[in-house]
Amino acid sequence: MKVQQYRLDELAHLVKGELIGEGSLQFSNLASLENAEVNHLTFVNGEKHLDQAKVSRAGAYIVTAALKEHLPEKDNFIIVDNPYLAFAILTHVFDKKISSTGIESTAQIHPSAVISETAYIGHYVVIGENCVVGDNTVIQSHTKLDDNVEVGKDCFIDSHVTITGGSKLRDRVRIHSSTVIGGEGFGFAPYQGKWHRIAQLGSVLIGNDVRIGSNCSIDRGALDNTILEDGVIIDNLVQIAHNVHIGSNTAIAAKCGIAGSTKIGKNCILAGACGVAGHLSIADNVTLTGMSMVTKNISEAGTYSSGTGLFENNHWKKTIVRLRQLADVPLTQITKRLDHIQAQIESLESTFNLRK
């Protein structure tokens, strides 16, 4: 199979960059600075990578004008303001796309479902009653769309995905393998020592340009819908409980868990393994560092942390012992000790004229 190649001047045009060098050069792929060969295009994202760039074998470099001045021994460049963004754009040029359309013979499609002629439905896909699949959408093998599910245009649904509960996906949504959208939320009413299941009557609404990784669970609402606004990106192994509302362009890293009826604002970042308790509200532009545990509302933008960073093991054990000892000391006693120490410091400053 012949590898598709692209001219350097064509690639520069796609990212609105300035071409310096030989525009007719052909490139078969993007590559890292370390592993690039002469038929590869690479990028330099900051001065810290200049040493690698100087010894790289790449045929051309995506750089800023300032970074180019540090690479006089190189000949071919695409000059842009943001090399990383240009790289992101060009990954889609070299990405291997699925060009098939139509419905595979092993797929099971309910007669009432509306499937675009430009969509692709893979082997052993099951699509239920009154479903809709939009133009240019790809649904890979063994995926199941239960009744009344709607998938918009230009979506990609990977294999072994389940979409249920009448979920609605807008355009350009990407969902990766083994994720469940619209599953039953964790709702139970306690009575007389038993848990009584609450039927989950809501759905899931997913906006444009949302990306959801593998092995995620996004539960449908109990009454109101679970909502992911436009541009939300979610890593693998994330749990989003019923009635959660996530604002546009929020990013959630792997192993995060968000309990029911919590609202997260726009442009937030949840780093890996964060936990968010239920029925809370988080403002726009909030960043939670890794393993943070949110137990109360966050009303102001900013960066928040909890938990303990890594210690050498013996140091960690000593710290835990001290924390336990501290917990046994009444707060009033600690306050008195601090007041006494402060008084001693002020007395010394006065005696030796150390006060500024």
Curated annotation (Swiss-Prot):
Taxonomically, which superkingdom? Bacteria
Residue positions of the active site: H242 (proton acceptor)
Query: What's a GO biological-process term for it?
Result: lipid A biosynthetic process
Pfam family, any one: LpxD
Catalysed reaction per UniProt?
a UDP-3-O-[(3R)-3-hydroxyacyl]-alpha-D-glucosamine + a (3R)-hydroxyacyl-[ACP] = a UDP-2-N,3-O-bis[(3R)-3-hydroxyacyl]-alpha-D-glucosamine + holo-[ACP] + H(+)
Q: Which SUPFAM superfamilies match?
A: Trimeric LpxA-like enzymes
Q: Which UniProt keywords apply?
A: Acyltransferase, Lipid A biosynthesis, Lipid biosynthesis, Lipid metabolism, Repeat, Transferase
Q: Where is the signal peptide?
A: none
A GO MF label: N-acyltransferase activity
- Gene3D superfamilies of this UniProt entry? 1.20.5.170, Hexapeptide repeat proteins, MurE/MurF, N-terminal domain
| One Gene Ontology CC term in the entry | membrane
Looking up HAMAP family in the UniProt record yields:
LpxD (MF_00523)
Its family?
Belongs to the transferase hexapeptide repeat family. LpxD subfamily.
The record's section on NCBIfam families has: lipid_A_lpxD (TIGR01853), PRK00892.1 (NF002060)
Assembly, per entry: Homotrimer.
Please report the name of this protein according to its UniProt entry. UDP-3-O-acylglucosamine N-acyltransferase
